[in-house]
Amino acid sequence: MADGIEKLPRGIRNKNPGNIKLGTAWDGLASEQSDPVFCVFGEAVMGIRALMKILLTYRFTHKKITVDDIISRWAPPSENDTNAYIDFVCKEINVNPMDKLDNSIEHYLPLVKSIIRMENGKQPYDDELLVEGMYRAWEGYPTGSSAS
């Protein structure tokens, strides 16, 4: 590995900032899957896209629209301290656990940033890259506060 790469958090190293587990044939996966548990993407923007696709599935398929609902599914108690994760995200984005999130960049960008920070201990991506990945995920989905 290149100098310093092995010291990066696993999710950043894998260009998978949401630490998405293997199992789905995501667009943008690297040809070599060097991690036995988590997906490795060729570009971080595609890992961000996958993270957002999951959040959109939570919203439109499972009707998860509060931080409590979203994080309880994202970080289940069988694998995480879900309540601590919810508290962290709520503090980061300044909402209450049961506040409903609008289906907009304004609401989901802070959520995505906080998930990345929680998963990796830091959030190294600029807003431009995050928004690009998020918009790639939103293709085909409605946007706006009325989309639920």
Question: Regions from the language model: what does each represent?
Answer:
Residues 1-148:
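Cell-wall polysaccharide-cleaving catalytic domain and substrate-binding groove, primarily
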